[in-house]
């Protein structure tokens, strides 16, 4: 219907940018986006808990690192369904969350490197902890004044 309105009003598809055309062609209904958000988010939680359970098995560090990272990636992908991938990427790299985004993405990569290539269990566990903390800090950036509240709580506890 929107395309018909654009054609009737004199706006051609040629006037739209390529990105807008691709996003228009691949847009999902709100119900579909909500369903996929829930599916990805639940899968992310499942993979994270599965990875945590595998940590206690003999030689389970590799599986822990892989599944925990996969869980975080699925949780991150879930928000792409709510706001769209382009908008999500733009928000991720805004100045308010740029540092948290970079640290989070580096920790995802370093967790896998430490577990799979470097074979350093302690380092993989450290990167998983940093991954959790950076993902939490990144998520708090979407809630107004949440970071300030956390900083005030931590500073009052420490001194």
Curated annotation (Swiss-Prot):
It is a multi-pass membrane protein. Residues 1-36, 84-97, 144-159 are cytoplasmic. It comes from the Eukaryota. Keywords: Membrane, Phosphoprotein, Protein transport, Transmembrane, Transmembrane helix, Transport. It is found in: Membrane. GO terms for cellular component: cytoplasm; endomembrane system; intracellular membrane-bounded organelle; membrane. May be involved in fusion of retrograde transport vesicles derived from an endocytic compartment with the Golgi complex. This is Vesicle transport protein SFT2A. It comes from Mus musculus. The lineage of its organism: Eukaryota, Metazoa, Chordata, Craniata, Vertebrata. The gene is Sft2d1.
């Amino acid at each position: 219907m929107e395309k018909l309105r654009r054609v009737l009003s004199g706006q051609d598809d040629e006037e739209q940018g390529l990105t807008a055309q691709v996003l228009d062609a691949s847009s999902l209904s709100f119900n579909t986006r909500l369903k996929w958000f829930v599916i990805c988010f639940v899968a992310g939680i499942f993979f994270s808990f599965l990875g945590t359970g595998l940590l206690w098995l003999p030689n389970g560090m590799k599986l822990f690192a892989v599944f925990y990272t996969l869980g975080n990636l699925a949780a991150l992908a879930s928000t792409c369904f709510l706001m769209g991938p382009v908008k999500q990427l733009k928000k991720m790299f805004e100045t308010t969350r740029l540092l948290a985004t970079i640290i989070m993405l580096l920790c995802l990569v370093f967790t896998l490197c430490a577990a799979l290539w470097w074979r350093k269990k302690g380092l993989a566990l450290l990167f998983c902890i940093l991954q959790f903390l950076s993902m939490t800090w990144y998520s708090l950036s979407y809630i107004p004044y949440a970071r300030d509240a956390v900083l005030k709580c931590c500073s009052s506890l420490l001194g």
